[in-house]
């Protein structure tokens, strides 16, 4: 069998990894082995953090809703329970947006929730 040389394939593979490692610091950008290891690690971080991002956004919505609720003399859990009892089904994204941008409408929701709790 003839001898197979990997020059072209290796060059292409190295270029692909080093191109993806642009923006990394020091040897993690310049040296193939370190760049490859860091690239694998960064892809793991990216995978994990795409899921973490969803949790963080939801936490932020809950914090915003709770802050607006406390301005209206009710806490978050009682407010959400009151909304559920009154039959209003608004998701946390919409509630957080209302709490930030339309405080009058949010105050009316709080009043509805308080009435349902009594």
Curated annotation (Swiss-Prot):
UniProt-listed GO biological process terms: ribosomal large subunit assembly; translation
GO cellular component: ribonucleoprotein complex; ribosome
CDD domains recorded: Ribosomal_L20
GO molecular function: rRNA binding; structural constituent of ribosome
Xref: Gene3D superfamilies: 6.10.160.10, Ribosomal protein L20 (1.10.1900.20)
Keyword rRNA-binding annotated: yes
Keyword line: Ribonucleoprotein, Ribosomal protein, RNA-binding, rRNA-binding
Superkingdom: Bacteria
InterPro entries: Ribosomal_bL20, RIBOSOMAL_L20_CS, Ribosomal_protein_bL20_C
Presence of the UniProt keyword RNA-binding in the record: yes
Role: Binds directly to 23S ribosomal RNA and is necessary for the in vitro assembly process of the 50S ribosomal subunit. It is not involved in the protein synthesizing functions of that subunit.
PANTHER family: 39S RIBOSOMAL PROTEIN L20 (PTHR10986)
Record family assignment: Belongs to the bacterial ribosomal protein bL20 family.
Identification of the protein by name: Large ribosomal subunit protein bL20
